[in-house]
Amino acid sequence: MIHNPILPGFNPDPCICRKGDDYYVAVSTFEWFPGIPIYHSKDLKHWELFTHVLTDDEKVNLKNLPSAKAIWAPCLTYNEQEDRFYVVYGVMNSMNARYFDVDNYLISAPSITGPWSEPVYLHSAGFDASILHDDDGRKYIVSLEWETRSGYEQPGVICLCEYDPAAQKIIGYPKRIWRGGTDRGCIEAPHLTKRGGYYYLMCAEGGTGYNHCVTMGRAKNVWGPYEGDPQNPIVTSAPGVSYERDDPDHLKPKYFNPDSLLQKSGHGSYVDLPTGETYLVHLCARPFIPELRCTLGRETSIQKMQWTDDGWLRMADGGRLAQVDVPESKLPDCPLPLLPEHDDFDAPTLLPYYLSLIHI
């Protein structure tokens, strides 16, 4: 069995991709540097910190940014046609006065270890941007359009625009394509993939708190219209029905589920294996009770999934509740050596596990 969380501690907003027999997960780092750690595995059970994407503070300026801002929700993809990795990420500058001031960027590299290109500015239309590499070579950026007007559903709606890699800029203005697959509100974290003739739009809903979940929509055309999965949400810690579209609060502790060891499960990303299996990574948390304080932060877990005959993604156990222990894949077992118990600060280089604040 695979025991969750696979990435314990501060590892939120996971995005998974595969190149050959190698699997990689990127997570958020906010104001901590170096930015965007990449974890590696060959069996989805044993994971190691492999590299960081943002290691040059000249390419990303995090100085003077407050806590919980800066690098949000990286989207890591591998384009097989180009044999190239892409990362789309946002730099959150401010969340004051209902307005989220965010700049979204794209970088790419021939290897997961780099060298990474200069950041290309995409837009500031919303956060949690990600990229789709379509079969015909075209590329699309999907993101959340932030709603600032009082009385409107918060935080907004999922939008799509095309990206021109030659000109290194988006084409036109983002078009609204999806308002969610449930009534939990607080839609975010869109990931767009293509499979079996459908464009699949995976999102998080309910806020990144106790009503968090993973939802799915699909369409035959990338611009829509998108239909929601009739079983939405497909993964969550709070499987009940709720209407929260008019509530911008993200925490929602009233939805704490005492029957779930993993709380706040949402913000997912899936990967298909050459064995015919599918797995989904998602963020989660393990709070102290009754205080509901998550001192380890938001962590990364994994769930075994399966595709139905009519093309929807389901948890392999037939439920929706995120599980602590999930079946292993058919991939060969690849255990890793134990982490070193000490580090030599007199050595030329240190182990890669250290982060530092760079906002001052």
Which residue stretches match the model-derived regions?
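Carbohydrate-active catalytic/glycan-binding domains of CAZyme proteins
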Residues: 1-358
